[in-house]
């Protein structure tokens, strides 16, 4: 599902970025992306093993936005962790979609975290992004094609 989802987003002219809290080096992740035939669909990747902060720190999200040359309003973050992914992305001004992960439990946090979308699967992000793009274009007075 990951490849078809990323391809559908790329076909819409969207950039794909990765921001990962990890102890592994970039080479490890690149091998995984090549193994899964995803490497050609990823435009930028930022790993906490290479920067002085990790999600949910604002600078982690700013780093991936900078790597993609995007503003927060132009980006959507998809993740499975309410605190690290949703809260962190929203604090920098991005929209955030949550894919609840059964192995992570309810991930209770001390503050209210409300994702902009909750997805049952990764593939659902395509329809959500299509809707958000139409809303974004309408707010700017443009017509989506």
What do these predicted regions represent?
Residues 3, 7-10, 17-145:
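Asp-based, Mg2+/Mn2+-dependent phosphohydrolase catalytic module
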